[in-house]
Curated annotation (Swiss-Prot):
Family of the protein in this entry: Belongs to the universal ribosomal protein uS8 family.
Gene Ontology terms: biological process: translation
Identification of the protein by name: Small ribosomal subunit protein uS8c
A molecular function (GO) term: rRNA binding
Function: One of the primary rRNA binding proteins, it binds directly to 16S rRNA central domain where it helps coordinate assembly of the platform of the 30S subunit.
Organism: Platanus occidentalis
Cellular compartments per GO CC: chloroplast; ribonucleoprotein complex; ribosome
Matches recorded under SUPFAM superfamilies: Ribosomal protein S8
Subcellular location: Plastid, Chloroplast
Length: 132
């Protein structure tokens, strides 16, 4: 049985958010790096750095906090396409999350991107997750 790295990323961030931790450590893969870059660009996390520990690489992400800096924002992440049930969409049928407030992360032929980027380029792909 294979590992679902996208579900691992989502679960790590969700657990750190629920436990009110400021940082989360995720095992490094190319998919993890691309998803974390999207979260950083969209403002769901503050900072990311690549960390090496005994020949293994990790991505250490700092979650975005509220203005009073006491606790992280509540970020909801939902895995859509999974290894047992793949969900694909063309660019015209990519769902809008909360009327465009949330984002959809897709895996396309041109890499991992958000729903807005996929609509602009006119390409569809596999819907990986929703974030709002």
């Amino acid at each position: 049985m294979g590992r679902d790295t996208i579900a691992d990323i989502i679960t790590s961030i969700r657990n750190a958010d629920m436990d009110k931790k400021g940082r989360v450590r995720i095992g490094y893969t190319n998919i993890a790096e691309n998803i974390i870059k999207i979260l950083l660009r969209e403002g769901f996390i503050e900072n990311v750095r690549k960390h090496r520990e005994s020949n293994k690489y990790f991505l250490v992400s700092t979650l975005r906090h509220r203005r009073n800096r006491k606790r992280p924002y509540k970020t909801i992440l939902k895995r859509i396409s999974r290894p047992g049930l793949r969900i694909y969409s063309n660019y015209q049928r990519i769902p809008r999350i909360l009327g465009g407030i949330g984002i959809v992360i897709l895996s396309t032929s041109r890499g991992i991107m958000t729903d807005r980027e996929a609509r602009l380029e006119g390409i569809g792909g596999e819907i990986l997750c929703y974030i709002w």
